[in-house]
């Protein structure tokens, strides 16, 4: 409804930014829904899309890697999808009560970020 209202009133934008923060038991469904939403936004508004914020709990790094690998694979062939940014990957467990980073308690990156190297 937001972009419909903006478009109807002559609003303009360069890129639509999206966020996605699934859990280990929801990422498959949420990735599918996110890709459908990306395709809908492109179709409806002709806009480029960027996943500006993604993340999962740091202590389930393997699930997070699977989530990211799947999402990267599903979006890489969508020309209008500009990319994916992990939000605050350097955050470690409990940093300012934020638990969705991709570093462990020793301050090292988890395997979650390996998805970006594939």
What are these regions (language model features)?
Residues 33, 40-46, 58-118:
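Aromatic-rich peripheral "rim/lid" segments of glycoside hydrolase catalytic domains that contact
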